[in-house]
């Protein structure tokens, strides 16, 4: 049986899932059915998801820039996520 590679847990790989969860949180908050405590928890989770999505977009943008530098099209190199700063 072939070994399965571990799932990619980079922000870019999780972007769609994070965005979908964020959209669901927003919908839940907009209904007004959440208590104050639930709303604060949802808001806190939403901020974390927003940051994940933002980081994923920055990494994707950097990856595209590295791979398609118009001044040096033959110098494309594989993307190394460890080179991206994760501080905010």
UniProtKB/Swiss-Prot annotation:
Record localization: Cytoplasm
Keyword Hydrolase listed: yes
Region (Disordered): 69-88
InterPro entries assigned to the protein according to its UniProt record, in alphabetical order: Exonuc_VII_S, Exonuc_VII_ssu_sf
Enzyme kind, highest EC tier: hydrolase
GO cellular component: cytosol; exodeoxyribonuclease VII complex
Domain of life: Bacteria
Signal peptide: none
Record keywords: Cytoplasm, Exonuclease, Hydrolase, Nuclease
Primary localization class, coarse: cytoplasm
Disulfide bonds: none
The protein's Enzyme Commission number: 3.1.11.6
Protein's name in the database: Exodeoxyribonuclease 7 small subunit
């Amino acid at each position: 049986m072939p070994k399965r590679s571990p799932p990619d847990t980079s922000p870019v790989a999780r972007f769609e899932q994070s965005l979908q969860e964020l959209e669901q949180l927003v919908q839940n908050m907009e209904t007004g059915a959440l208590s104050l405590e639930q709303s604060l928890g949802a808001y806190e989770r939403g901020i974390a998801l927003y940051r994940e999505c933002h980081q994923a977009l920055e990494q994707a943008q950097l990856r595209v820039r590295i791979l398609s530098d118009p001044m040096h099209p033959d110098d494309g190199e594989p993307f190394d996520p460890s080179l991206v700063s994760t501080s905010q």
